[in-house]
Curated annotation (Swiss-Prot):
SUPFAM superfamilies: Protein kinase-like (PK-like). Residues 115-132 have a biased composition (Polar residues). GO terms for molecular function: ATP binding; poly(A) binding; protein kinase activity; zinc ion binding. The N-terminal zinc finger binds to poly(A) RNA. Contains a pseudokinase domain. The protein kinase domain is predicted to be catalytically inactive because some of the residues important for catalytic activity are substituted and it lacks the equivalent of the binding site for a peptide substrate. However, it has retained an ATP-binding site and ATP-binding is required for mRNA degradation, stimulating the activity of the pan2 nuclease in vitro. Homodimer. Forms a heterotrimer with a catalytic subunit pan2 to form the poly(A)-nuclease (PAN) deadenylation complex. Interacts (via PAM-2 motif) with poly(A)-binding protein pab1 (via PABC domain), conferring substrate specificity of the enzyme complex. Regulatory subunit of the poly(A)-nuclease (PAN) deadenylation complex, one of two cytoplasmic mRNA deadenylases involved in mRNA turnover. PAN specifically shortens poly(A) tails of RNA and the activity is stimulated by poly(A)-binding protein pab1. PAN deadenylation is followed by rapid degradation of the shortened mRNA tails by the CCR4-NOT complex. Deadenylated mRNAs are then degraded by two alternative mechanisms, namely exosome-mediated 3'-5' exonucleolytic degradation, or deadenylation-dependent mRNA decaping and subsequent 5'-3' exonucleolytic degradation by xrn1. The lineage of its organism: Eukaryota, Fungi, Dikarya, Ascomycota, Pezizomycotina. Keywords: ATP-binding, Coiled coil, Cytoplasm, Metal-binding, mRNA processing, Nucleotide-binding, Zinc, Zinc-finger. A zinc finger (C3H1-type) spans 26-55. ATP binds at R314, D363, Y364, Y365, P366, L367, S368, K369, T370, S422, K423. It comes from Aspergillus clavatus (strain ATCC 1007 / CBS 513.65 / DSM 816 / NCTC 3887 / NRRL 1 / QM 1276 / 107). Residues 523-561 form a coiled coil. GO terms for cellular component: P-body; PAN complex. GO terms for biological process: mRNA processing; nuclear-transcribed mRNA poly(A) tail shortening. The gene is pan3. This is PAN2-PAN3 deadenylation complex subunit PAN3.
Amino acid sequence: MASAGKPALDDSRRGTGSPKMKARENAKDTLCRNVTIYGRCRYEDKGCAFNHDPLKVNSAYQFDSKKRFNVDSPSFTPSLLPSNGSSPTISSATMKKMATISPKAANAAPFQPRSVASRSNTSTPNSRQENINPDWTVAEVQEFVPQGFDVAHMTALQGNGNGTITPTNAFDPFVTASTPLSAGGAVGPVQPNPYSHDSAALGGAAFFPGSSGFQQPVQYHMYAPIGPHNQNTLGYQRNVHDLFLPNDFREELQKKAAATLQTLPNTQLPAQIDYFHSLVPLDLNHQKNATVFGFPSWVYKAQSSKDGNFYALRRLEGFRLTNEKAIRSVQAWKRVCNGSVVTIHDAFTSRSFQDSSLIFVTDYYPLSKTLAEQHLGTGQRFQGRHNVHIPEQVLWGYMTQIANALKAIHSNGLAARIIDASKILLTGKNRIRLNACAIMDVVQYDSQRTVADLQRQDLVNFGQLIVTLGANSPTVMHNPTKAMEHFTRAYSPQMKNSVFWLLNGLQKDQDRNIDIFITGISSQLMSTFDSALHLDDQLTSDLSRELENGRLVRLMTKLNLVNERPEYEHDRQWSENGERYFLKIFRDYVFHQVDAQGDAVVDLGHVLSCLNKLDAGSDEKITLVSRDEQSCFIVSYKELKKALESSFQALLKPARRMH
């Protein structure tokens, strides 16, 4: 029986035909999907039955389109059009009318598809050519095409390529696109590219976005990395400096802030000098030294009672003012505003130190050093240690900054008169400022030397300072010949010639002023200026990381202002239900986490992560459980942010009505 029934089963299979075998037979006319996706098929020479030539498939597709559409057939004209959204009711008279062809339909021009007409040689009669409407094409939206994919497959989607759209045919971006190998050349709606600009407003202009569009507001929780980016790191690598302020810069600012706020209790200093209080001595050497000014001088940090700022007070001990015009000369120095000169704010006499003292008020730079302390070993803890040789580029930086200071001073008809390593402040990395400039104008007010002579003396003092720094010895100018020999061996000829020109500043052989000197070192000025620009870029980049760093504090402030307000317990409009109940449970989720043993979880990372997501309004959903564990809610951070903003605005409404 089994053998007898077997042939009948085979006959039935041969009669119906196997779909798998039919697909095998048509495999040679089907384009391999590997070619469409990857551009090539690795099994092409290993028995793959599909076609690997896109041109053959395209020609077969065009031939199939020509077979399916007959251009000589009459156009179809429906005799009854349904209304919008309603199905028509067809009567017997209407059915009879539809059974016959109207004379208008018999004389109509033959139907010709647009996609076929562009590829066939058949043309419509010339008498009907003028009445044809402009060709309708789909918006040429730039789409992703895999590598190796033949662009001929997209011809059915591009229409005739004239780039025009009939206004009555609005583009619908939500209609699913038809595949190139379906519908036999019919033009279907194309799914827009989500990465193209304003795809719904494209009028055939694929590469020109619309003029109007909604601009999203700035998201302050996102920090944009501002240049410069000089680190040789890969795209996935991150440094600590990419996330926070550089440690050395942060520590330096914190130390300066601590030094500014430092106080000295139980001190023998006066409690107040004029309008200054909280004096702290800044001198490292407690021995009296009257070498520079002719009077022992001391420096203090003090706070002003007028504006609350901190200033440096330089006191000349034992000075007696004999001429009131001498102290008025400080008024001219108040007009000197230069980045390389320490600004002078005031000068007055005082007897608060139980003597007659002259006080100069200048800007205070915390943790600053003098060039003598930095390079000449003055005040060092280990006296036997040799000083480090100053690189030439650093020395050029000092020269350009001092030249900048002298340019500003001489332009105001003044002279520095004090250019000494012990009176030049180093306030930052290779950043110096000329200090104690106005003191000699008060102390030696009766001097008979002219301003021009004093300005030339500034050039000589300038040259002696550079030689002293280059030799790393404060007493090197006692033997000028030996000092210049060492300087010539250590530095370039341009540096040597510049210093020689400064040392000969008092000679009358030629006109010597600071402008001529600046012209001679103009090439080094550009190098110093470039370094200043790089520092500005770096500081701007560091500052951008600290932008809006108080946003989490504002967020926590809003949460605490909204949650658990006892005065609104019986207010129906402010009862803790709905969105305010979510915020209350969310506060417990962020700050009141417990572990499996019931101990409090102090996780700063969890708190910052939740607050950042709340500030950003993330779509991430979290599960919130009530305190009695009887209610469970699944909400997103976006919903929580919206609830927080609405609750906070509702909290402000009574205050607005009062005002």
